Amino acid sequence: MLTRKQHELLMFIHERLKESGIPPSFDEMKEALDLASKSGIHRLITALEERGFIRRLPNRARALEVLRLPDSIAPGLNAAKKFSPSVIQGSLGQGGLGRQIKPAPSRLPAAGNDDDAVSAVSIPVMGRIAAGVPIDAIQHQTHSISVPPDMIMGGEHYALEVKGDSMIDAGIFDGDTVIIRNADTASPGEIVVALVDEEEATLKRFRRKGASIALEAANPAYETRIFGPDRVKVQGKLVGLIRRY
């Protein structure tokens, strides 16, 4: 039997993972449950872990997995677990420096006998994205992957393999595959693919500092980088994440 706060936290974590594949931060959990401090979140997570509802993934900051839900809503969790995480092996496009990412439209695969394949959406893998020091701009599609349709909510999408550890406190790790919705604008606080000086691509949290744009890491080892507005172009916004365990 869960307490009301335990149940609220479990469902908040579950819904966030279902929407984006990324667990909420302790600050987000504290605000969602209207608690005064993060110590209360630590106690609730420990209680949920002891009861077998969640588990903390070892050696990974802020990495949580929902193992089960209360019996009355467990079928929804089972349905969400049909999709198995995988690692995408991307590569940098050659000769494409300084050009913007141009993903192909996401599309449904042809109907077949495999129910999972029919319900999946195929999106292009465009290579690697830096979650650290920016790397050369990504240009060419390497291959495609299939993702659950509820991860794609309209618009054009593409996938990138994460390289680096600057976003670990946002639950994004080296080797993860991020699902990006093509966009050229972002709201403050959103995680974006940013093209810097027409030649370097990086995955960072988007902020505004007066007339300037700040690309903020989610790792205290990395400094926030500030640029003039004409030096940064938003290439897309994070909508999901795929991970191999």
UniProtKB/Swiss-Prot annotation:
DNA-binding region: 26-46
InterPro entries named among the record's database cross-references: LexA (IPR006200), LexA-like (IPR039418), LexA/Signal_pep-like_sf (IPR036286), LexA_DNA-bd_dom (IPR006199), LexA_repressor (IPR050077), Peptidase_S24_LexA (IPR006197), Peptidase_S24_S26A/B/C (IPR015927), WH-like_DNA-bd_sf (IPR036388)
GO terms of molecular function: DNA binding; serine-type endopeptidase activity
Catalyzed chemical reaction(s): Hydrolysis of Ala-|-Gly bond in repressor LexA
Pfam families linked to this entry: LexA_DNA_bind, Peptidase_S24
An annotated GO BP: DNA repair
Enzyme active site: S166, K204
Enzyme Commission number(s) from the entry: 3.4.21.88
Site (Cleavage): A131, G132
Keyword match DNA-binding: yes
Keyword vocabulary terms for this entry: Autocatalytic cleavage, DNA damage, DNA repair, DNA replication, DNA-binding, Hydrolase, Repressor, SOS response, Transcription, Transcription regulation
Primary role: Represses a number of genes involved in the response to DNA damage (SOS response), including recA and lexA. In the presence of single-stranded DNA, RecA interacts with LexA causing an autocatalytic cleavage which disrupts the DNA-binding part of LexA, leading to derepression of the SOS regulon and eventually DNA repair.
Quaternary assembly: Homodimer.
Family the entry assigns: Belongs to the peptidase S24 family.
HAMAP family: LexA
Protein name, as recorded: LexA repressor
Gene: lexA
